[in-house]
Amino acid sequence: MSNAPSNTPTGFNYKPGHTLYIRNFGTDMRARTLGQAFEKWGRIVRCDIPISSNPQAHRYAFVEFEEREKAELAHEKMRNAKIGNDIIFVEWAKSRERYHRDDKRRLSNYA
């Protein structure tokens, strides 16, 4: 069992600094297609597109690189890249702790 922190509440484990969070792609995007678009920057350990129980939810993905430097390069090069008909957004994946901390900040703005 890995000691790596869980990502967002989906429960994916990953190495911090090695994993990118991808969003803004259509329902026809497949993990294999997304992974192939990123693998030119380095070896990919995993590419996941979680399945939501809510069909209206926006799709997102996690792309994990073997080497941190390759993830940094992909983060720089793939921001606002076009894959098929989609212009994707690329951010660093957050740990579960950071996700919840940021979520609490958002909720506190409404108090």
UniProtKB/Swiss-Prot annotation:
Location within or outside the cell: Nucleus
Source organism (scientific name): Schizosaccharomyces pombe (strain 972 / ATCC 24843) (Fission yeast)
Keywords attached to this entry: mRNA processing, mRNA splicing, Nucleus, RNA-binding
Cellular component GO terms, alphabetical: nuclear speck; nucleus
Protein's UniProt name: Putative splicing factor C222.18
Entry similarity comment: Belongs to the splicing factor SR family.
GO MF annotation, one: RNA binding
PANTHER family for this protein: SERINE/ARGININE RICH SPLICING FACTOR
UniProt KW Protease keyword: no
Highest taxon of source: Eukaryota
Function in brief: Has a role in pre-mRNA splicing where it is involved in spliceosome assembly.
Pfam families: RRM_1 (PF00076)
InterPro entries xrefs: Nucleotide-bd_a/b_plait_sf, RBD_domain_sf, RRM_dom, SRSF
Gene3D superfamilies with a match to the protein in the record: 3.30.70.330
One GO BP annotation of this record: mRNA cis splicing, via spliceosome
